[in-house]
């Protein structure tokens, strides 16, 4: 990724601000979520191969579309209705100045309008025997944000895995179980951040190693227990004894307990995905921080003094400190960030990066499945759209008939 600011889980893209899961040749994107091959667009979600679009959901192969959803290979549309190119340009004039008030108004209007558009039960593309959401080019995989995976279950942000179970944030592991980021590893079990390893158990942050048990921070090592080097024969004998005893305890078969994390719960992204109160966290035996790294009350520029339109902005903002409209945290605008706002004709944000990140996550569906029925044919479906949500949800067959 090049020139990306306040983004998460983005790759092979450049010139991005406030994006989440923007992948594969995206450029000049602002507030885009779950998109691929997007150029010069803002406020898009679950869209592919689009350019010069704004406020869109599930668009494919579209250009110059504004406030549209479920369109395929369309151009010059507003709220899913075709308009002449000159009329489109005229109606976009007010938005082109990068007005904050206009952008906020459009967010509200689009959120209400889009409820009338049916949603596909899940975003699963070119895959076979898969269940979850945001799954692409995979076979017999269950999970969320899954790319080119085979024979895997309970996967989260996984790429090119084979025969793995309970994986988080990883690429190219094989035959691994209950791990975080065992990238390019083979037979790694119950371990965290062990890359390019094989035959590793209950270890943390070990790289390019093999045959380790209860180790941490090792590189280019083999036949170690608790970071102590053994011969191959001694390692195999001791490891067999330890594992036989471990098999009778609750430790065996699980990754390290969350309470052993060096980070407080509210310091991590877990707080955004699965928010808990302080009492809930402490009751589970986990850490809670009372001193998160931010300041308040040190602002030097009042939000009321920031021009509504980006075309009226001054470089003076680069030397000032702002206060978030939502949480009062202080934040600053960076020079390359401001340049991208101007280039993309989007307004200066009034919220801090943390609150903007929270709002983006709120637009994504939860990583959980519900049993529902297709809103058109009544077929049983497993979907990340909770039953109480207001959207109309269609099975794959009914949705494809709707959009093609």
Where on the chain are the PLM-derived regions?
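Long, distal/terminal scaffolding or interaction modules
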Residues: 1-404
């Amino acid at each position: 990724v090049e020139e990306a600011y306040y983004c998460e889980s983005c790759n092979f893209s450049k010139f991005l601000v406030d994006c989440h899961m923007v992948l594969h040749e995206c450029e000049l994107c602002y507030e885009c979520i779950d998109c691929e091959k997007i150029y010069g667009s803002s406020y898009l979600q679950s869209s592919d191969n689009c350019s010069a679009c704004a406020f869109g959901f599930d668009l494919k192969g579209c250009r110059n579309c504004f406030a549209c959803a479920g369109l395929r290979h369309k151009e010059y549309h507003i709220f899913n209705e075709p308009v002449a190119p000159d009329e489109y340009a005229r109606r976009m004039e007010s938005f082109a100045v990068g007005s904050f008030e206009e952008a906020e108004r459009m967010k509200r209007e689009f959120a209400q309008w889009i409820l009338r558009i049916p949603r596909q039960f899940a975003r699963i593309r070119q895959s076979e025997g898969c269940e979850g959401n945001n799954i692409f080019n995979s076979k017999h995989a269950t999970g969320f944000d899954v790319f080119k995976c085979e024979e895997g279950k309970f996967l989260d942000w996984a790429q090119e895995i084979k025969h793995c179970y309970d994986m988080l944030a990883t690429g190219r592991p094989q035959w691994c179980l209950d791990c975080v980021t065992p990238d390019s590893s083979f037979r790694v079990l119950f371990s965290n951040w062990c890359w390019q390893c094989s035959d590793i158990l209950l270890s943390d942050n070990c790289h390019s190693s093999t045959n380790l048990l209860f180790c941490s921070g090792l590189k280019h090592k083999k036949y170690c227990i608790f970071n102590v080097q053994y011969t191959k024969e001694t390692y195999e004998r001791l490891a067999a004894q330890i594992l036989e005893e471990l098999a009778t305890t609750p430790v065996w078969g699980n990754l390290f307990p969350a309470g052993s994390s060096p980070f407080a719960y509210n310091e991590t992204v877990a707080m955004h995905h699965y928010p808990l109160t302080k009492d809930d966290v402490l009751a589970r035996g986990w850490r809670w921080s009372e001193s998160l790294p931010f300041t308040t009350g040190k602002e030097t520029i009042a939000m009321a003094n920031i021009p509504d339109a980006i075309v009226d902005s001054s470089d003076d903002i680069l030397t000032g400190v702002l206060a978030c409209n939502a949480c009062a945290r202080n934040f600053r605008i960076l020079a390359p960030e401001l340049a991208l706002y101007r280039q993309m004709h989007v307004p200066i944000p009034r919220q801090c990066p943390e609150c903007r990140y929270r709002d983006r996550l709120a637009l994504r569906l939860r990583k959980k499945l519900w049993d529902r029925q297709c809103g058109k044919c009544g077929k049983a479906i497993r979907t990340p759209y909770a039953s109480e949500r207001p959207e109309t949800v269609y099975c794959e067959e009914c949705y494809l008939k709707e959009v093609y």
